């Protein structure tokens, strides 16, 4: 009991210190001098009551009936003057603006250590976007508090660096170039088309031809994708979400994930973009749709995918106006997730050429691609895959085994989604996600109804 009391007191002391820092007080004991005291709050309440009473009095005078017969007009006039004089005195007083200094104004929950965490209001006041305050977003410090994940990322990066093919690139106009001339099938295809939306938001003239979604849909992606493959399509933040799904469907892929790029403005707060004519608010994120072709199971296809290694969010600083390049972190997400070595980047640039990838784009300044040389890197049966070590297999997140394989005691009782959830094959089918190769996209535990009874 004493330890619990000491813990509560320590939290209270820390909370008061943080409050003092936020409110500009000298110390935790001087918070009361900054906040409204009880006398000030009582004075504000009395002022409101006086104003309300004076308003009621003036309304009563305006609705007063005609004077009775025999009552002197001078008495009526004198009563009206007596009721109007207090109102004139209040009007002559200087206007006093109410300044709300109470710390509970923006308090979200009684256990909050930071009472002024209304980031939307902070954006209005300073121009700093709310996502600026998300911590540990960089690749270097993201897993500082998770040593196993940090070690897993290090081992995978070392293995990827050893198994990468030399960087290859080809300057080609994708409007007229036949992708089948690459003479190869690919496990991963990343598309970064220059959409009209990018140039419309920046408000500057395009230095390269922008593509419409009709042109993007005409690309022969289905002709160069392997029997099981993934496609990653950058589609902006507007109507591209719908058109991107249409492209995936036309190419024979199923949409399975949406990777969001959240843009911060720490270096240049308050920077505004040209507002899209179809938008009400300024958009500060972009979407990269991920599609899958073929059948990929997380539990059985560990030689081709490693799920749940990364998250589906990229949080980086927004590039300068006119720069439509995407964050380099998308390459790390793809390489950590898919173990296929045949990677193709369409609409690439000189700055995106990297080992392990074939980069094709109209803005490249040089070419070194040779179809025979590229095919020679994948002659042996297992050469299209990066492989896996015992340590990586031990550290990587895996799909939980079925309940029937966990032991005698673990299979007792039903799932959280109802009586039938978790029993036999039907229960496992209900617990299975909508995408078998998904990176953790489960609909919930025990079926679609999480912890409640199924609707009648």
UniProtKB/Swiss-Prot annotation:
Which regions are flagged for Basic and acidic residues bias?
65-74, 423-441
Q: Give the residue ranges for region: Disordered.
A: 43-74, 395-456
Sample GO molecular function, one term: mRNA m(6)A methyltransferase activity
> Quick check: keyword RNA-binding in the entry?
yes
A GO biological process held by the record: mRNA splicing, via spliceosome
Q: Where is this region: Interaction with METTL3?
A: 135-136, 237-238, 255-258, 278-287, 308-312
UniProt KW keywords: Differentiation, Nucleus, RNA-binding, Spermatogenesis
- Annotated positions for site Interaction with METTL3: 146, 242, 245, 298
Q: Which PROSITE patterns match?
A: MT_A70 (PS51143), SAM_MTA70L_2 (PS51592)
Q: Where in the cell is it found?
A: Nucleus
Listed name of the protein: N(6)-adenosine-methyltransferase non-catalytic subunit METTL14
Q: What's the encoding gene here?
A: mettl14
């Amino acid at each position: 009991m004493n330890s619990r009391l000491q813990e509560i007191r320590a939290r209270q002391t820390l909370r008061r210190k943080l409050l003092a820092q936020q409110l500009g007080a000298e110390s935790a004991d001087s918070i009361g001098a900054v906040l409204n005291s009880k006398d000030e709050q009582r004075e504000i309440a009395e002022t409101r009551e006086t104003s309300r009473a004076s308003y009621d009095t003036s309304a009563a005078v305006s609705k007063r009936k005609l004077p009775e017969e025999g009552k002197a007009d001078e008495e009526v006039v004198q009563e009206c003057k007596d009721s109007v004089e207090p109102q004139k005195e209040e009007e002559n007083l200087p206007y006093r603006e109410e300044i709300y200094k109470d710390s509970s104004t923006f308090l979200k929950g009684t256990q909050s250590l930071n009472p002024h965490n209304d980031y939307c209001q902070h954006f209005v006041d300073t121009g700093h976007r709310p996502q600026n305050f998300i911590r540990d977003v960089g690749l270097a410090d993201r897993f500082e508090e998770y040593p196993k994940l940090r070690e897993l990322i290090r081992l995978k990066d070392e293995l990827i660096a050893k198994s990468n093919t030399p960087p290859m690139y080809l300057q080609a106009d994708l409007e007229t170039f036949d992708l089948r001339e690459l003479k190869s099938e690919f496990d991963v295809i990343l598309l970064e088309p220059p959409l009209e939306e990018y140039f419309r938001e920046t408000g500057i003239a395009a230095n390269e031809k922008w593509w419409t979604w009709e042109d993007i849909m005409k690309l022969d992606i289905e002709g160069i994708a392997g029997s099981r493959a993934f496609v990653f399509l950058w589609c902006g933040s507007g109507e591209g979400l719908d058109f991107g799904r249409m492209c995936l469907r036309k190419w024979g892929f199923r949409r399975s994930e949406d990777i969001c790029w959240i843009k911060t403005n720490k270096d240049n707060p308050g920077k505004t973009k040209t507002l899209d004519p179809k938008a009400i608010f300024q958009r500060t994120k972009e979407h990269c749709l991920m599609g899958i072709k073929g059948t990929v199971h997380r539990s059985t296809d560990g030689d081709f995918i490693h799920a749940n290694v990364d998250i589906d969010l990229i949080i980086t600083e927004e590039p300068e106006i006119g720069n439509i390049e995407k964050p380099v972190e998308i390459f790390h997400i793809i390489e950590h997730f898919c173990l296929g070595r045949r990677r193709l980047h369409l609409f690439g640039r000189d700055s995106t050429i990297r080992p392990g990838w074939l980069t094709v784009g109209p803005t490249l300044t040089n070419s070194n691609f040779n179809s025979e040389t590229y095919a020679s890197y994948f002659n042996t049966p297992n050469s299209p895959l990066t492989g896996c070590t015992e340590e990586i297999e031990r550290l990587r997140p895996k799909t939980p085994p079925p309940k029937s394989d966990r032991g005698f005691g673990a299979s007792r009782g039903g799932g959280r989604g109802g009586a039938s959830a978790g029993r036999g094959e039907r229960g496992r089918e209900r617990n299975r996600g909508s995408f078998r190769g998904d990176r953790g996209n489960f609909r919930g535990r025990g079926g679609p109804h999480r912890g409640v009874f199924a609707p009648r």
